[in-house]
């Protein structure tokens, strides 16, 4: 996207970020390309992901905390779009998920499809075939999930399983399970499923994970769910935390809280011993260590 911005003659790059991973990636490329970089991030997320905030600052980006609304990803996206509308001549907005107005959802999915290309290559080497029986990924806006499934969408042999953020439970009012709770609406220029009240006002989502804390979903995933091409599971905070600790202790891999939701979905599935299951661990857990430490202290069942 930054190469595209350079080709278009833009001088200023803006981005939104929830977990901070997209912000760090954008700041990294801007440092490499010597371009001005401004990252919008909800104040709540700045506090809970401050390691990534410091990385962005080290890379030369300006991080602007957003204090409106719930002070999370939706609000950061609002501010980034507002900035973009005010400075269209010199500014390019690097969207970090399959959300926003066309062509962003399609463009981000295509660029992320390097993930499923890599899955095909690795499966061919490891298993002698290019397709798995199950593909699993977490879904907030839907970028890593889109990349994971991109080359398999039309392959009926592959069961797609998406894990969205159930928060404290989908019936509690503290959730970000958009596919299960959402109704058709428009958010940030995309027609998709949106968590909204009966008046059509967008509800504030909740998730322990900053990257899944979004009241919409990429239109591609809303469509796949409607067509019943994907099985969508809501994974609550407790299930995600437990799965993260399990992976850490069994494999020595500390996953991001977002990815932990995909791991939490494993317990809800029943596989045959011969099934090939590919699960995308979309981020590393360095940024979430403080949350994990806090949660392990309060949840004795994790010990």
Which residues does each predicted region cover?
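Buried hydrophobic packing segments
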Residues: 1-5, 26-29, 80, 148-152, ...
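Active-site-proximal loop->helix
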Residues: 2-4, 14-17, 22-80, 171-182, ...
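A short, small-residue-rich loop immediately preceding and capping a beta-strand
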Residues: 2-29, 33-42, 130-144, 160-163, ...
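Flexible loop/turn segments at secondary-structure boundaries
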Residues: 21-24, 46-48, 73, 101-104, ...
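Active-site/ligand-binding loops adjacent to catalytic centers
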Residues: 77-107, 129, 154-157, 162-253, ...
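A glycine-rich, Thr/Ser-enriched phosphate-binding loop motif common to dinucleotide/cofactor-binding enzymes
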Residues: 103-118, 256-261
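Phosphate/pyrophosphate-binding loops at sites that engage ATP/ADP/AMP, CoA/4′-phosphopantetheine
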Residues: 121-130
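Claisen-condensing/thiolase-fold acyl-transfer catalytic domains that form or cleave C-C bonds
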Residues: 139-143, 147, 237-300
């Amino acid at each position: 996207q930054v190469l595209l911005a350079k080709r278009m003659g833009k001088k200023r790059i803006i981005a939104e970020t929830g977990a901070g991973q997209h912000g760090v990636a954008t700041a990294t490329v801007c440092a490499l390309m010597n371009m001005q970089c401004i990252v919008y991030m909800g104040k709540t997320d700045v506090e809970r992901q401050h390691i990534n905030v410091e990385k962005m600052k080290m890379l030369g980006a300006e991080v602007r905390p957003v204090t409106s609304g719930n002070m999370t990803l939706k609000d950061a996206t609002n501010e980034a779009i507002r900035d973009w509308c005010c400075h269209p001549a010199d500014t390019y907005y690097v969207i970090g998920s399959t959300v926003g107005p066309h062509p962003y959802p399609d463009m981000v999915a295509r660029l992320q499809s390097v993930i499923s290309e890599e899955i095909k290559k690795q499966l061919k080497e490891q298993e002698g075939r290019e397709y798995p029986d199950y593909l699993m990924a977490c879904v907030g806006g839907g970028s890593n999930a889109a990349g994971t499934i991109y080359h398999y969408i039309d392959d009926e042999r592959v069961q797609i399983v998406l894990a969205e953020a159930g928060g404290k439970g989908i019936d509690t009012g503290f959730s970000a399970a958009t596919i299960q709770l959402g109704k058709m609406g428009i958010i940030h220029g995309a027609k998709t499923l949106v968590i909204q009240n009966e008046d059509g006002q967008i509800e504030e989502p909740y998730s322990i994970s900053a990257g899944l804390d979004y009241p919409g979903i990429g239109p591609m995933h809303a469509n796949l769910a409607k067509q019943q091409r994907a099985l969508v599971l809501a994974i609550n905070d407790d299930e995600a935390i437990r799965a993260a600790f399990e992976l850490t202790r069994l494999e020595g891999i500390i996953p991001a809280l977002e990815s932990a939701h995909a791991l939490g979905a494993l317990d809800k599935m029943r596989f045959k011993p011969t099934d090939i299951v590919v699960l995308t661990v979309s981020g590393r857990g360095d940024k979430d260590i403080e949350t994990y430490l806090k949660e392990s202290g309060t949840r004795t069942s994790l010990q």
